[in-house]
Amino acid sequence: MALLQIAEPGQSAAPHQHRLAVGIDLGTTNSLVAAVRSGVADTLADESGRHALASVVRYSEDGVQVGVDAERFSAQDPLNTVVSVKRFMGRSLSDIQAKDASLPYNFSASENGLPLFNTQAGQFNPIQISADILRPLVDRAEKTLGGSLEGVVITVPAYFDDAQRQGTKEAASLLGVKVLRLLNEPTAAAIAYGLDSGQEGVIAIYDLGGGTFDISILRLNKGVFEVLATGGDSALGGDDFDHALAAHLQESWQLTSLTASERRALLIESRRVKEALTEQASVTASLTLEQGIVHEQVVDKAQFDALIESLVKKTIASCRRALRDAAISNDEVLETVMVGGSTRVPLVRERVEGFFGKAPLTSIDPDRVVAIGAAIQADILVGNKPESDLLLLDVIPLSLGIETMGGLVEKVVSRNTTIPVARAQEFTTFKDGQTAMAFHVVQGERELVADCRSLARFTLKGIPPMAAGAAHIRVTFQVDADGLLSVTAMEKSSGVQASIQVKPSFGLTDEEIGTMLKDSMAHAKEDIERRMLAEQQVEAARVLESLSAALAKDGDLLDEAEAATIQAGMANLAQVASQSDTDAIEKAIAALDDASQDFAAKRMDNSIRLALKGQSVDNI
């Protein structure tokens, strides 16, 4: 396996000049910015001493407010106050509303179906809102460090797809900030712990944030970070704990309907109770309705644990799958790193310790560890540590492939392949004289295109007319360090080519992310059987087309009995191929092959005779 050097080659033009770069953890609930100063990476505080910036933006007639200033209005002005915008990045409006129809926002759809938040200050999409969260972090960094930034490393969940990653980069570009790299959040945590603790061996990164869950299995060895496997859920996080408790309280208080402000106030109170229960055995939840009615209820740890148990079990199931993908057993995991504020919940730590058989690492603040790792990476990428031997091997979470005849998937880049990566594979034409080829790029683990996610389509035109199977089309998949995919197809004899960069309009739906891997395992046997059937059906179609063309050209070489035998074999194959018996199709192909052997020999003899016609022995 090739190891990928992340440090930029060569020395700086001014080798003793420290270049300013930071790491930004753009989180669902809170965001942080960190930098390396005097060789130590740490998060940067604002003027009030707060390190975390609430990922909340309020748009009013008076302007834009970000952080705690906006958060104060989240209950009383929910229509104009956007929280957890990271959950909306790269997703369609229809997908968002299907997931939660009770969101307290006034939405409209853009031309391509993406969500627009209608506020007093105008319409804003998730990219613009994310840029407004990034702006105070960049300003804080430049003020603290005393200069302009040369670049930033922004962290994203490992399960973010191309659209979500591209949206994150575009948010930074709106500010004129250079993105040195998008870094997976679990990998950033590994960088922080790998350098600070000097760990070597297999480590699990359990990252439970406000809106996403990621599990990564990494092998650390002498500065090399190799990601063995990743998994998780882009729609599961601490916010879901809040929603579970809020739903319980609403039912207990028999509140059949709430206004948008009351609903937001209930979620805020649920979060407060959740956080208090990390230190206390019980907490009193309280909600004051707009009519002045006050509801109160004591919530103890056992009640809260019962509400979130199923959600925590989902994360453990993802851990189990990731270990299986990495071919690692529980006892081979030396340490488990806890990342994200939601890992402070006692039940989460109990279940993680129970699964891995050891207490998880929490020596670095789980809220700040990702930003710290990103800062270390930014310091290397900007050229402050050209001698660094830090190597980072990231992976793609789902296989990438192309559709072939019969609706089959030919995987070009397998799941858990390290990135950046380039893979090439050759394909050919199916019909004589074919001058164009349509390509369908898909993502997923299933054997049939219908069961995978469509990413993009493009067409290669101008292929020189040739016999079926004679053209050689080389298809290259390239995945860059940010997980963005480009696909190029080139016909080798003519050099004609076409390419596409895959930037899907929408992100993966919650259902797709949660079920794609499980479905691939649950349907593995069935999928293989369906693939074998489809392959035989494609081969049957190829044989029938080839024989039909041969009969049209050289049918006069056969007598009536021979022609009738072949025609009968073709009719039998066509009839069998329309059914679902793989073995029967294979036998029918073999029978037709036997029946047409003499015809093939006669065609060969005829071709040789025509080629030698008029030639002398000396010429031969």
UniProtKB/Swiss-Prot annotation:
Highest taxon, organism lineage: Bacteria
Keyword check for Transcription: no
Nucleotide-binding is among the record's keywords: yes
Pfam families: HSP70
Disulphide-bonded residues: none
Listed GO biological process terms: iron-sulfur cluster assembly
PROSITE patterns, A to Z: HSP70_1, HSP70_2
GO molecular-function terms, A-Z: ATP binding; ATP hydrolysis activity; ATP-dependent protein folding chaperone; unfolded protein binding
InterPro entries tied to this protein: ATPase_NBD, Heat_shock_70_CS, HSP70_C_sf, HSP70_peptide-bd_sf, Hsp_70_fam, ISC_FeS_clus_asmbl_HscA
Function statement: Chaperone involved in the maturation of iron-sulfur cluster-containing proteins. Has a low intrinsic ATPase activity which is markedly stimulated by HscB.
HAMAP family: HscA
Name assigned to this protein: Chaperone protein HscA homolog
Organism lineage string: Bacteria, Pseudomonadati, Pseudomonadota, Gammaproteobacteria, Alteromonadales
Gene this protein is translated from: hscA
